[in-house]
Amino acid sequence: MPKFNKKLIYKIPIYLIFLIFVFTLFELISFDNKYINKKSITFDVDNVRNPQIKKLVRTIDNLSGNIYFSLSEKKKKEFFQIDKNKYNNLPEEILIKAKEKNLTISNKKNKENSKNWQRSHGNQSSNKFSSLKQINSENVDLLDVAWTYKFSKKGVVPGNAIFFEDKIYVSTPGKSLIALSAEKGEKIWERPTEGKAAVRGLMIHENKNIYFCDQKNLNSINSVSGEFNLNFGKKGKIKLKHKCQTTPVIIDKDIIIATFEPGIEVYDLSSGKIKWKFYLKKITKDFFRYGGKRFDYSGGNPWGGISADVDRKIVYISTGNAGRFYEGTSRPGKNKYSNSVIALDISSRKVLWEFQEVEHDIWNYDIASPPILTSIVRNGKEIDVVVAPTKFGNTLVLDRLSGKSLFDYKKIKVPLSDVPGEKTAFYQKKFLLPEAFSKQYFEKEDITDLSPESTKYVKEKIKDASYGFFTPNSVDKKNIVFKGGAQWMGASIDNTTSTMYVNSSDMPTFLWLEKVDKKNSYYRYSSNFEIIKDQYGYPGSKPPWGNLTSINLTNGKINWTVPFGEYEELTKKKYYDNRNS
């Protein structure tokens, strides 16, 4: 019988541990030398691809962080202490005056509206407005259905279709892109994709190639044949490291996309070769670890979309909220680049400016649609601007090159959070103009008046809740906000009149936190929300719950507002009074 080498047997566990260590180290490392504002080699738990390894690393990371936090009085003080003296000595409000000098004189490129629709959102300015006059207010009621095309699968298609050379191109609820005859609605071709195609949109270039993301890839397809453009990337595809679902833009020979890194990536339009990337986060050494936890750099994704000033070679980006929706204990500070409109100069590869609407967002007030490039008149001169309707009901009107607001706004001192470790911003912006197109914060007067019974029911339901202008969320106590404003559909702007049209919703919603009892969890609190409804299932605030609003962007005044959407049974009972129309 052969003899076993006892020393070798004893070494096997050591070898296994070493192999696991090496494999884990390999998983933690990521190499990408195309970022111009980020290190080529990063060492982070978020780089880990293997789910079992990621779970192990997170557990070790959280455990070590908790031990470090429990032993460090300095870190405890840093986490829990808020400078209330500084807060109390601050003024209640600060007026920020509108920019009046050195405005961006218009290059007249946005004076007219598009007469075609070769990109979701209408064009690269994303103004979603057509100058075609064949269909108008005098004959729209005479329209009849010419044809209907039914998808093979059910689901939502958020990105609107595009039109080119008598064909309609649209993504399906499944994983494919189709071309239809505009005249008959017959399918010409269907191209399967790896992921869900063109979730937020697609575009077609003058080279007759269609460009879109399927979350996993950037694709180029010939619009005539439906075949992949084999000269682009690898057989018509570019494998992406990070998810992409928004519509690309094209500037000269570059095609530009926004990813969930979050980042901007620039590729050669012909070959698909990567040129450079820009990381849309501001990482500082001061915020590597906070409260024993790794600083939460997640979120802030540009999922709302991007637009392009082709002549000036500038990409404009709208971003989402940082980290988790309703709590920010692991991400102190303003969370730069989140809840913002950002201007990125493609020639210099630098950020020209960024304008943040909500600081340290814990209410889910991200900017959900792409910025719109248009112009308004100031002091008799036409000025190029960037416009962004938001979930908070604001309309940001910013100078195209400086990013400064063209309307006054106030910074209002807001309540501090009572959640341990939650350091909310001392101030939030309140825009005086343009006038808000949706309800911005809940008040008692907003309680439903559909019936005395409904009023009583909702009053009882919210009696212990908090509400107000940017009132922070609490643990086990509900906070009321209006969930709605402008969603991912965004707005339309008539460039010839500087008029914006936006649909919005006003849904009263409970937000609250619950303490996480799970040992070594990365998150201290879980985030929760619930739409407030009466006993019959209707929203708990006064109707209308949705509006269509027209706003004059030159003076910031609302032209008109009409209810948009209905419950048919309430309409029949004449519950709607159209008091806001």
Functional labels for PLM-detected ranges:
Residues 428-507, 547:
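Long, low-complexity segments enriched in small/aliphatic residues
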Residues 117-121, 156-176, 195-217, 242-264, ...:
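Repeat-blade elements of multi-bladed beta-propeller folds
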Residues 31-133, 426-437, 445-448, 453-458:
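N-terminal pre-domain segments of enzymes
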Residues 122-124, 130-169, 187-193, 475-483:
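Asp/Glu-centered strand-loop micro-motifs enriched in Gly/Pro and often flanked by an aromatic residue
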Residues 2-19:
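N-terminal Sec-pathway targeting helices
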Residues 138-152, 177-197, 206-207, 218-242, ...:
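Extracytoplasmic/lumenal domain signature
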Residues 19-29:
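Hydrophobic alpha-helical membrane-insertion segments, chiefly the h-region
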